[in-house]
Amino acid sequence: MPSKVCTLILLFSVINQMKCGSTTDCAMRVFKETIKEMSEVADLQLETLQNLSPDTKRQMKIAIMDVLTSMGLFLEMSTASSFSFATLPIYMLRAQNLMNLLSMDLENLQPEQGTLSESVEKMKNMLISVVNTLPKKAMICFQME
């Protein structure tokens, strides 16, 4: 059964097939990889949280999908002619702000068991670590130019 995440990844795979300049191609690949990594982390972690009520699980998936959708917006912006070394900090700041929003969403969920908060914290940290690799990946794109 295809999920929204799989559909999103498929969409970015199609977009990535388009012919563009090398920096744009690299930026698109970076964001596609990041979205894939985030979806894998989210899917894996949600599977391990067996004690969640359906409503809480749904809220967590919505929060994660909001971030992935926003990452898709970054992918679209990265293909714009304004995407450059000078505008990179703006994109990174937006990505960090999205992760802060995700953190707040996760903190607002009421843990249903004592061990749940540890699992949610682990998932949050894993997602944040994926986003934190973006600047390094983006720098590789600019060095290729």
Swiss-Prot record:
It comes from the Eukaryota. This is Uncharacterized protein C05B5.1. It comes from Caenorhabditis elegans. The keyword Signal applies. Keywords: Signal. The keyword Signal applies. Residues 1-20 form the signal peptide.
